[in-house]
Amino acid sequence: MGETLDRQLGLLRSQLVYRAIPWRGAQLRRFYRRFVPAGGLAFDVGAHLGNRVAAFRQLGARVVALEPQPDFVRQLQRRFGGDPGVTLLPQALGRAPGRARLMVSPRTPTVTTLSGDFIERAGASPSFKGVSWQAGPQVDVATLDGLIARHGQPDFVKIDVEGFELEVLMGASRPLPALSFEFLPAMRDVALACIDRLEALAGPGHYRYAVSMGEQLQLLRPQGEPADALREWLHALPHDGPSGDVHAWGPGAGSGTRR
């Protein structure tokens, strides 16, 4: 009974956060227009309630949406199940195919994760005070390479996986045109390792990088900067500073047109 109530409260909380602002959809479309071209393909890794999925579809792209949490898979199926332009996959991504145990946070489902390191380190941060996790279901895990082989090369990949970002990128063997991944100052080493992975995949200097903070949907340096500048910026963040997303794009991407 208590666990069911916690899950219902968590779902309601997510709905209030992601759907209660009537103009948020327009903000999302404006923000992602440069990365998601009409007629393109976007992967939403960690789709949650699908606010990014909806924005990508409204921009005219096909979407492959991955979400391993059963409650949110059901919500996504209700919302997008009849849309032939959306492929819903109830699974996670990692460095190798297989199965893994979700660690769920019923009252704060946005921080459900596959990363035990995330629970230990982020959970000790003051901003996570009161957040708790428990063992959830076993879920299927695929790779970016497998996803690309099945669905095609994406124009943009959004990665929101609570400390598992590097594991997702380790499942790719070739550069992605454009992508974003979440960072947390308490775990900045994961973000730094993600940058190293991208630079290794594409070669030094291939990507430009820019950060957006929280849900502000605004790049701090829209023109982007090289990897070393972003590394320096991440190192300077206070330990309990706000989270955000790193955006990276290569030549020909980030212009709002198909490659």
Where are these regions (language model features)?
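Phosphate/nucleotide-binding beta-alpha loop and adjacent structural elements of enzyme active sites
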Residues: 1-259
